Amino acid sequence: MKKVFAWLLATAVLPLLCCSCASDVNAQNPAPAAEKKLRVGLFVDNGASGNGLFHLAGLIAHSPQAELVTLMGSDIRAGKLKDIDVLVMPGGGSRKQCNAIGNDHLEKVRDFLRNGGGYVGTCAGMFNVLECRMKLLPFDRYLNAGGSTAWVSVEVNQDAAKILDIKPGIRKVRYSGGPVSYALANSKSEGKGISLGVYKSSVSRSKEQEGKFIGSPAWIYGSYGKGKVIATSFHPEYEESTHDMMLGCFYAVSGVKLTPVFPKKNYRPVRVGLLTSYAGGHKPIELMLDLERHPDIDLDYVMATELDKGILKHLDVLVVPSPQKAMLKKFFATDLRKKQFAEFMNNGGVILDIGEAEGAIQPHKNFIKLPKNADVKKYILK
């Protein structure tokens, strides 16, 4: 009987001891906390434009390591840079971007960097880095030395390879009017910087311009206070073939490697174009991400370049989110545009307007004006 009692006591106490031991072990080795996401602020106000803005938003938002925050100039003036880790200034117009922030408030960007923030700029975003704008790194630009949209050759030097964790060599990249820059011996900038590689080919309009273009820094990197700055004169965000360069830029300023996972699509999804011309702001980005995440919607970004290549022949629906009525009216006013959109709608294509395209595009039964708060997905999937 004593043996039975001892056995029962042991079996009752053993789980308690095990639980106690486990508690001690857990107390000494607590479960790892969830990894904090990199908070990336994307500037979407006036001066941020074009497909590049939406490509950047997709790369960031679809990366599990990052959280996308869209920023207007008023957000920066209100001190919201303190809530992010990296500021991204996209292509568009650098003067307009600075004006949207307010020239009296550009010091907030510099303070953000002094305190350890990161800065990533493409095209206009590189203009902002230069002596002529925010004075973040000791570089400036030649006047009227750039060119039109084209594929050009860019060097990835040994510094770039190490800083971005990519392979050195010569790469083909998309260029579209970015700054042709040069290093300054005497600069007003507090920052220190280096070239990550130079242009090896040119789209300049003259021999004189070409002499400035070839051999000029295509991208630059440096420090400003405790923060890090990287900027590209070209557009690595556009094409999958250069995404490693774009993602390397985020790594260079944050130490975090973004690995975007794009939404999978079902067989034969609805082919949708998003007109990105004049479409900055929070809502167009939110709309883009909402559409892109749906498995039955295959989304393309559309500007004049894509229209000229005949993209409307491959779309079922075109969504127009821009609120800039005067600019849209001018955009759709040419005989070529009128013909393109008439053929698109006559052949069954549908235009969904949640912006201000009404009156800019000729009336048609397939032109549908939607309420501002409409669920665009529902109309597309009808």
Model-predicted regions and their roles:
Residues 18-33:
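Bacterial Sec-dependent signal peptides at the C-terminal "C-region" and cleavage site
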Residues 30-38, 62, 110, 133-138, ...:
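Extracellular ligand-binding/catalytic regions of CAZymes and related secreted enzymes
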Residues 154-242, 283, 369-382:
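Catalytic beta-strand/loop cores that center a nucleophilic Ser/Cys/Thr
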Residues 114, 130-173:
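Class I SAM-dependent methyltransferase SAM-binding "motif I" and its flanking Rossmann-like core
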